Amino acid sequence: MSAPTSRHLYGRLLGYVKPHWRMFALSIVGLILTAATEPMLPALFKPLLDEGFVAKDQDFIRWVPLLLLGLFVLRGVASFISTYSMAWVGSRLVMDLRAAMFDKLMALPTRYFDQNPSGQLIAQLAFNVTQVTQSATSSLTTLVRDTVTVLGLLGYLVWLNWRLTLIVFALVPLTLWVVRVASKRLRGLSRKAQENIGDLTQVVDEAVGGHRVVKLYGGETYEQARFHRAANLARQFEMKRVAANAVYEPVIQFIAAIALAIIVFIAAGQASANTTTVGGFVAFFMAMLLLFAPLKRLTAVNDQLQRGLAASETIFALLDQDAERDTGTREPAHIEGRLAFRDVGLTYPGKQTPALARISLDIAPGETVALVGASGSGKTTLANLVPRFYDPDAGRIELDGVDIRDVKLQSLRGHIALVSQDVVLFNDTLAHNIAYGSKREASPDEIRAACVAAHAWDFIQAMPDGLDTLIGENGMRLSGGQRQRIAIARAILKNAPILILDEATSALDSESERHVQAALETLMQNRTTLVIAHRLSTIERANRIVVLEGGRIVETGAHADLLAKQGRYAQLHALQFSQ
């Protein structure tokens, strides 16, 4: 797939500006007025010299200061209007793009997050969007204002002496060729620089998020080396971009200087031959000099523009991702919780070996089924199919006899609760973490009842602010067992008929595990439960144990029956309890 053109990217960016067209139009008017005052300055000096200093017209000289003041007042007002209006549009553009990106992230399937590092996504939201703003607003300010300025000055030069001005136009094709070559180079370098910023963000995100592991295992030097490598790589690409731009700008300016030198030489000859006035010569020369500043800005804006367009490529690549497919039409208000897997198979993208193969399993309402197997056997993958984090490649999954693909995603997931060892808590109060999402309007009494059932009320009461206690990023102010019980309270409050427990009691001390296990027993009552556990002692009381190996079911039965079979489960059990 070919890369989008600059015109296409800029057109899409301007589409986000369209809702704010009034402020945008106001800024354009201000820019045009500001630019229009530029050629007025040399135009004022021609009659000043010819009429005031040569012809000694005192009446005209007295008007010149007033005209100059009026000119700069007009320029100042127009500049304020354009600057403020464009900044307003730019800030709205940043907000709208970030909102669109975040909304898209919330709608993307799980596989997208599995395939894209969080650091890259954070960099796109935080860094790339501001780069795009430079492209859509700041660059546009320069392009409009300075293009109008250049056109105005060129028009004035044509009016003064069209023959001399033709020299300027003769060098335009060469200038455009240089701009085209530089644009391609700058876009590629800007794209690489932004990718490196994403890598840098990823290193920081991992090192900060895993700071305890880093410190405990003495990984500081390794992480510092990773960061320095990423930072140096980002610096190298940035310097390549700067070097390309540093070469490109002087080349453009040298071309302009050639034109200026030729014009000055010819104009000086005309002045000595009395074919032009002093005022005409000074005005022409002054207008030529005034061309330098906007031309320099126009050549420099290409670097800024290409950085923004390179950033917009990554942003629109995200926005163009297909949202999670929701093929369902049914919204069952109540379900019994009967699950059935019918010849289910799944192969992850880019993998040759299937993660699951021909899985057939019936689970009765209220039954607790434990999924057991070595790492990579397919336990978590199988559980992830129930809420449709992934869809199977083959076969189907039924809920109360209905293919889950026929149930709306929101409705399906509304009937499922999840508690895992990787508890996700938000930097908010305990109450808001428990009454989360669809349960946001739960009453204090309902929240308290869920906390009591989860064996969490005692430690919550001991906190200074109770349920209003802020728990920090991912619940960092809570112990591991407390975090688990908050997650269980959240699941109890949801009161979903299907429950998935993914390693919910691993990595806990004995006291915490006792509390969590008691809370889980309360949670599992009258619910269809899938339990994933490496610690076989935690699932001995399951109604049924399903043993997976290589993505296939190799054994199924109760704990005692499977031990008596002396099969794969007995081997896993013996191996674990011999350690």
UniProtKB/Swiss-Prot annotation:
SMART domains: AAA. Involved in lipopolysaccharide (LPS) biosynthesis. Translocates lipid A-core from the inner to the outer leaflet of the inner membrane. Transmembrane domains (TMD) form a pore in the inner membrane and the ATP-binding domain (NBD) is responsible for energy generation. GO terms for molecular function: ABC-type oligopeptide transporter activity; ATP binding; ATP hydrolysis activity; ATPase-coupled lipid transmembrane transporter activity. Keywords: ATP-binding, Cell inner membrane, Cell membrane, Lipid transport, Membrane, Nucleotide-binding, Translocase, Transmembrane, Transmembrane helix, Transport. Its EC number is 7.5.2.6. It catalyses: ATP + H2O + lipid A-core oligosaccharideSide 1 = ADP + phosphate + lipid A-core oligosaccharideSide 2. It is found in: Cell inner membrane. Residues 339-575 form the ABC transporter domain. One of its GO terms (cellular component) is plasma membrane. CDD domains: ABC_6TM_MsbA_like (cd18552), ABCC_MsbA (cd03251). Disulfide bonds: none annotated. In MsbA the ATP-binding domain (NBD) and the transmembrane domain (TMD) are fused. The chain crosses the membrane at residues 24-44, 63-83, 150-170, 251-271, 275-295. It is a multi-pass membrane protein. It comes from the Bacteria. Residues 25-307 form the ABC transmembrane type-1 domain. The lineage of its organism: Bacteria, Pseudomonadati, Pseudomonadota, Betaproteobacteria, Nitrosomonadales. This is ATP-dependent lipid A-core flippase. Homodimer. Belongs to the ABC transporter superfamily. Lipid exporter (TC 3.A.1.106) family. ATP binds at residues 373-380.
